[in-house]
Amino acid sequence: MRGLRPALSTFIFLLLITGGVYPLLTTALGQWWFPWQANGSLIREGDTVRGSALIGQNFTDNGYFHGRPSATAEMPYNPQASGGSNLAVSNPELDKLIAARVAALRAANPNASTSVPVELVTASASGLDNNITPQAAAWQIPRVAKARNLSVEQLTQLIAKYSQQPLVKYIGQPVVNIVELNLALDKLDE
């Protein structure tokens, strides 16, 4: 019975710290230092939320740049089902899936002259990635230009405008946020 009081005191103390103080403190600091990120990095147009800068969307129309495939198959880019496909590189099912994606991209982009960029046929670890390389976006320019009656130069400039450089020059690569890029495309039509 003597050991019960210290154990119960420790339990209550840790419950208050880990279940109350720590979550409230990290939430408050997040809201104070990083309010946009802490609230989901929402992209707004007026009062309308158009998406998140952190989660991709399923753009399938020829007039939009396509992002990485989603690993959340039933509902693409479903954040509640986040996760990779868990197919090993040696799995024949992954080979079939990638071959089907390459064939679909080749059919949708018949004027593309180079091989299909790898990030357009492979899902990210989260299955929700919204970024592709500027090269993968540029690969899609002929299709988007034709569908929207825009020049290659206009789309090249738009990709350059929405390209983000890595925080550390030699770690990572430049990326383009597909959601922001496609919203900018819609604004060109206005």
UniProtKB/Swiss-Prot annotation:
Main subcellular localisation: membrane
Keyword entries, A-Z: ATP-binding, Cell inner membrane, Cell membrane, Ion transport, Membrane, Nucleotide-binding, Potassium, Potassium transport, Transmembrane, Transmembrane helix, Transport
Keyword Transport tagged: yes
Known role: Part of the high-affinity ATP-driven potassium transport (or Kdp) system, which catalyzes the hydrolysis of ATP coupled with the electrogenic transport of potassium into the cytoplasm. This subunit acts as a catalytic chaperone that increases the ATP-binding affinity of the ATP-hydrolyzing subunit KdpB by the formation of a transient KdpB/KdpC/ATP ternary complex.
Protein name: Potassium-transporting ATPase KdpC subunit
One Gene Ontology cellular component annotation held by this UniProt entry: plasma membrane
Assigned protein family: Belongs to the KdpC family.
Organism listed in the record: Escherichia coli O157:H7
Cited InterPro entries: KdpC
